[in-house]
Amino acid sequence: GAAGGGFLAAWLVPRWGWQSVFVFGGVVPMVLSLVMAALMPESLTYLVHRQGSQARIRRIVERCAPGSTSEDTVFVLPAQSRVESHERPVQIVLNRHYRAGSFMLWSIYFLHLFLVYLLGSWLPTMLKDAGMDLQQAAIVSAMFQLGGPLGSILLGWLMDRHEAHHVLAGAYLLGGAALVLLGYVGGHYALMCAVAFVIGAGLNGGGTGMNALSSHFFPLPARATGNGWMHGLGRIGAVISAFAGAWMLNAGWSLAAVTAALAVPAVLIAALLAMKYLHYRGEGRTAK
C-alpha cells in the first residue's frame, strides 16, 4: 500500500489535479471503516474478557475452526496474575511489572518511526543530491517501501518459530548494516535498489513485528492502551525526523554520513530489544 500510493498519485494528479489524491485518501478509508464495522468480527479474547454473548463467540470460533464447538461450549480466560482487579489500563501499563517493558517499547518505537519516516521523507532528496537522476531516486525509494511487505511476512514466519526479540534485533541490525552500505554504493544503480530493499525489509518489517511484540507483552485489559501509547509516543520520533532530515541536508551532510548516522538508532533498537528480553526472560509468552 505504501509503495502503491506513489504510483496511484502519479496517475491521479495529471488527470484530476493534486486535490484528487486527498479526496481518494479521505473517501476510501471512510468506506473501508463501514465495511469493517459490518463484517469484521470482534477479538475473541476481548469478547470473553467483556463477558460477551457465548453464542456470538461460538459463531466466530466456528468460522475459524468448523465443528470445534457445541451449544454447551463456554469460553473463559486464565486469570492475569500480574494485574490487580481494580487497576485501570494506564495503571497496568505503568505498574511494577510492566513499567520497564513499557518504557523500552516506547523508546524502540520512537527510534523506529524516527528512522522510517526520515528515510521515507528524505531518501529521494538525498539520492538526488548524491547525483542520481529523479527517476532513479524515485525507484530506489520505492524499493525501500517494497521491502516492507516481504520483510513483514518473513519476520512473522521467523517470530513464530524462534525467540521474537532475537529475530527483531537481527532485523534491525541487518537494516542498520544495509544503511551504512547504501552510502558507499553510489553509482551502482542496481545494487542501490537491492540495498534499499533490504533496508525496507529490516526496518519496515521490524515495525510490523514490533506491533506483534507489544500485543503479546501487554495483558488483555491494557493491550489497546499499551499499543496506543507506543504508537502515540513513537509519533514524536516521526515529527522530529522531519526536522532532523532537513538539518542534515542543510548542513551539507553526504549520503554516506547520513546513512551512517541513521544506523545508530537501528543498533540502539537492537540493544533495547536485548535488554527487554533479558529483563523478562523466563516468563514465557508474557515476555514476548
Residue ranges and their predicted role:
Residues 205-218:
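Intracellular juxtamembrane helix-capping segments at the cytosolic ends
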Residues 166-181:
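Structural signature of the two symmetry-related core transmembrane helices
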Residues 18-81, 268-288:
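Central mid-sequence intracellular linker of multi-pass
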